[in-house]
Amino acid sequence: MKVKKRWLLLPLIPLVLAAVYFFAPRMIPAERFGFAYEVPETERALRTKLVDTACAWAGVREDDGSHRAIIDLYNTIDPLPQGYTVTYEDAWCAAFGSAAALEAGLLDIIPAECSCNRQIGLFQALERWEERDGHLPLPGDYIFYDWDFPRSFDCTGWSEHVGIVVGTYGPFIRVMEGNKDDDASYRTVWRNDWCIRGYGLPDYASKCQ
């Protein structure tokens, strides 16, 4: 029996799709990422200030102890969220984002926390939470992840990680994250990626009035 050659290619389709999913975000030059749409210049400046503050910590690592300066900065927040002093051994992604907000002078619109889920709750209380599929974030927004693959394909579970949106380009989002593989570094994800739990949206416009 003669098998048409095109049917022999079918097993390769999942591999090709997986390769596109994994490698495509990593092929976009960093300078391409930016604002998906225009915002007032004063708001743009505030958002850029937070992003620049976070990105200045790129390369900070646990193994050489350089992340401790970020933890120390977070622990100067008064009062400390939950009254808890973060240790150098704790997961520090949320502390990273909160320390960046402190350094940028934006704690009045960005709720500080060392817990991803408690920070989500704080954004929700401020009515600054968004989890609709297709949301287009801006630089300076907070992106929360849930790494547990959702059985219903609707990511509404427990958030294990958070980062700060650096910018978007087409279907991609570039993020600066603390405690990404134990250091501070960039991640590029697909907009609508299954692992995105939602976004905390600081009210930058309120500081520009």
Feature locations, PLM:
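Short, Lys/Arg-rich N-terminal segment immediately upstream of the first membrane anchor
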Residues: 1-5
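Aromatic- and glycine-rich peptidoglycan recognition patches
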Residues: 7-10, 14-44, 149, 153-209
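Terminal low-complexity, poorly structured segments
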Residues: 8-13, 69, 76, 118, ...
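N-terminal capping segments
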Residues: 24-106
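Intrinsic disorder/low-complexity signature
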Residues: 59-64, 69-72, 114, 138, ...
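Solvent-exposed, flexible loop/coil residues
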Residues: 74-78, 124-130, 184, 193
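The N-terminal extracellular segments of secreted preproproteins, especially immediately downstream
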Residues: 92, 113-115, 194, 207
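...with weaker cross-activation on analogous glycine-rich loops/strands in unrelated enzymes
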Residues: 107-182
